Amino acid sequence: MDSAALEKMTGAKFPAVQGVIEEFSRDRVQNVLGDMRSRQVIKYAVGLSEASVQELRFNWPCFTWEEESVPLPPHPFAAYSRRAFTRWAIAQCGPVPIKDFGGNWFLHWQWQTGVHSCCPLLNPRDGAHQTRRELNMESYLRTHGPKYDKFNELSRPDLCHHRAEDCSVRAKAALSVDSAYDMGLKNTCKAMHRAGIELLHGNILFDPDMLIEAKMEGFVAGMNYHWKKTRRSTGLMSSFLEMGSSLFGVSNSSKEGEGHHDLKIKMGSSSTHMVPADWEISYHFRDDCVLGYTHNLADVLSIATGSYVKVGNTFYELERTGLKSGMLMYTITACKGLYDRASARSTPLSAKASTVIINGMSYQVGEKLDPISFPYLAASFYMQAQKAVFEVQQVVDLHTPNRNLWSWFKKKFELKAHAFLFALGLRDSHDEWLLDQIEFELNETVCTLPGEFLEPVSEVERLDAALEDWRRDRERLNGKSVENLKTLTVLVELAKKLGISAYEVLNSHQNESERPKDQWHVEAALFEAVELERAHWKMLTAEAQAMSLQDPLSREAKSKGWSYESSDSLPCAYAYVFSEGRFVKPADLKKKTRVLVSPSMQIMNQIRMAESLEKAIAMNVKSCKKTWIDGVAGCGKTYEIVHTADIFKKDDLILTANKKSQEDIFSQLKPGTDCAKRIRTVDSYLLKPDVQAKRLFIDEAGLVHPGKLLAAMRFAECDDCLLFGDSEQIPFVNIVESLQPAKFLKLEVDAREVRETTYRCPADVTATLATLYKKKKIVTKSKVLKSVTSKSLASASAVSGLDPHSWHLTMYQADKAELVRVARTNQMDDVWIKEHIKTVHEAQGISVPHVKLYRFKTFDQPLFDAAHAEAYRLVAISRHTQSFTYIGVNQHLCKADRMLKFVICQIP
């Protein structure tokens, strides 16, 4: 790409373009040019209302909006929104051949974009549009023609009158500006496949209320249009339209049944509502009594609720990227090769029950939703139920003799549907063989089983009967109350002792100066930890009742429903396990018995943890000196623990906040088996505090609730406790929304030591960390000067592979799930996935050579954008020793991204 090409592409002169090309990569130049192309001037008529102008500027801040003395176009706000979207989409596509499906060829000719327009004449309205554009072109030439030295400086309009799916012109990218109404998702993808198009940007007028059955009509204030659902008329108007279509020599695809299919959607009730091909939706603009549009309802809803279409060997994935003033924007991306879990993604719900895809964006359970997304959420729930029914039917169809049961489990359900073993009723002759293959200790998971022919249930009646028995038994499963009277009793006793109510123990600082400060804070922090564990238990069991008990055959249901009761006699918190052909309670088993569990089963130790913390409250308090080692990122806190603690003499005990930190210490110490009890996680030690020590070392102490830290000190009966962490990195995070932590998250310590030298962070990162750290300084010993880069993606689906030598981080679990999907598509090993793909919260404490941080959404995300989330960004940028790459979707749209601002400052 030379300077002349750049000048022609952007319409501007660049004296130093050649130097820019030499300094930056081709990708970066194209990104800069795309942003410059999008920052163009769009002129609007003087008569446009001020409110409309302000909304246009808010929706499209990348353009400069200027007045001009021209007549107002029909439905002006919609027209200018369409114009802005067209320019924005062209800029996103970059300097590649582009097609416009049914677009305005006059605008492309006027702007000299070189876009090919497919403008089929399907009815009289299309003919009127064609005539109007020809007149506009003639008027434009009369007005602006004299300024061109030669007429041939203006190229001829690049258009055809073929349908997009019939056009033979090839391209790399495409636009679909208000054109998908007549094509639907299926025909749009067919048109992309024929033309070799890899990326399409499109929009339609859409109101979420269209998904609700009771809403047969509505009004969208932004675009100022009415919509109404009707059945196709067979009267005089229908005859007139058919006659008009025949005059142009073409027939409407909806008349011939092309590109239309019955679409099941959720319309505000529990019943299934079919949308046959004769249902239509009409649009009428309030500020234009003449113009109106009628389209096939199924085609419109295919864009609003669809996910992917397979054409040949190519999958086309649809992502809805935004809803602006009644305009739904979306992208369709071609995915070559195997598409992982494509059958599961055919609905708006993802492959995990905790993740739902709404309006093209994935949300994790607990994330806040914009109210505009609620109708999408209702549609997603409906599609989830439909998929569960489909999967049950799949299972019934597979219940035939001589079927390879293990292959069926592995390929169809990946050991997540352990409830099937209960419902299938394995043949008695194979029970002993099955148990021999899965002999392991409690808390283990099933290893790879050899292929073996087993005979599942072949009678549907037996399957239904077994499931009905299981459903009737739910009261017994849910019989135990999670309330713990002992907890309430001790709480009341402490309240009486302090002279205040039980509520004030956890939520008030009144008259604090009159109480022994240290004792009061210690006991209050311990009680808060107890209440958090109990609230966490309630949250998980409530989720299990809502998800798992509905249908034991549903792959989407997390199998937390099996864990309702705890057992003090076993180191296993599963409430029910599969053993000897049936589900039984662990309390009824021997300690070394054989059991079957699955990766979806969750250990629930909350009640046992609460009981352990209560024991710590009742213990006699032993004085312990608490020292906080406050070190910057990469200062060698773990190294100091390893070389200071002497666990072989059994005088020291090392506890860590997570399993990864424990494994890191093990790998450096290489201790014998006798040391295993002295290098543990905090939770493991609190559940079984069977060793004591004079000195207690706690790594990443800031991630643990202070109540648990104090309980560990009491159980260890230590004289000194050294707490290692960074007071300005991620602190303890409460995941239980029903119980907000009180004011005891700050641990009172006797001494504080500071470590200000980092051996990990490169110089450019250290310079920024110096501005982020408020309580301490930071200097580096690293010889790496520059380590930070960035990369912008068109969409999340553009991530086709992962660097096996890098660690891949995300801020949110939903983005992590997307990376895991990509890794499994590329046949990455599960051990590698567990080690190399983490959230930033999970990665706190690690030190690795190369890090890539991903952001897949362009709307506001607090951990990237909010000022109060500096701790997360501090952790993210301080994990690497050599390189850090920030990868985001459409980064130029993320104006509030504080992480991106940091990265831009570091790039030379």
From Swiss-Prot:
Interacts with RNA-directed RNA polymerase 2a. It comes from Olive latent virus 2 (isolate Italy) (OLV-2). Its main location: host cell. This is Replication protein 1a. Disulfide bonds: none annotated. Residues 47-341 are annotated as: Methyltransferase. Belongs to the bromoviridae replication protein 1a family. Residues 629-887 are annotated as: ATP-dependent helicase. GO terms for molecular function: ATP binding; helicase activity; hydrolase activity; mRNA methyltransferase activity; RNA binding. Pfam families: Viral_helicase1, Vmethyltransf.
